[in-house]
Design a protein with these regions (language model features):
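Rhodanese-like catalytic fold shared by cysteine-dependent sulfurtransferases
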Residues: 7-11, 20, 24-25, 29-57, ...
Length: 141
């Protein structure tokens, strides 16, 4: 049948469907890897935040300067989420970064943005300052 032999002719009727299935699976995995986020983040609670703080993690409060002044995690730096595009490149990629806000929504948005930029060592504090205060952890002014 010449140069245009089919897979079925080359490998027999039982092997051809397996090759086809393997090819489709590989194509799907490559597609998902290419379309997925470059980085990732994990949701954590106040306890994990304060353990990481003691271990030297970078803690970023993404609230407004006014909110930050009313009380923040000791050692946190204030980088408002509205300005994430300006400050994102200054955050080290090789160090754990913990993000929080009032309730966890703005910090989640910042974490998603940084993850798209390739950050993988990211943690979003679920519940934010509200959860931190409820759990009895200290805030400073």
């Amino acid at each position: 049948s010449g140069p245009s032999m089919t897979r079925r002719a080359l490998f027999g009727p039982k092997v051809a469907p397996l090759i086809q299935a393997a090819s489709l699976t590989l194509a799907l995995l490559l597609f998902l890897a290419a379309c997925g986020p470059k980085g990732s983040y994990e949701n954590v609670g106040p306890e994990e935040l304060y353990e990481a703080l003691a271990a030297g993690a970078l803690v970023v409060d993404v609230r407004t300067p006014g909110e930050f002044a009313q009380g923040h995690v000791p050692g946190a730096i204030n980088l408002p989420v509205e300005e994430v595009a300006r400050w994102a490149d200054r955050i080290p990629k090789d160090r754990p970064v913990y993000l929080y806000c009032r309730s966890g929504n703005r910090s989640r948005k910042a974490a998603e943005y940084l993850a798209r930029k390739g950050y993988t060592n990211l943690y979003n504090v679920e519940g934010g300052v509200l959860a931190i205060a409820r759990a009895g952890y200290p805030l400073v002014r």
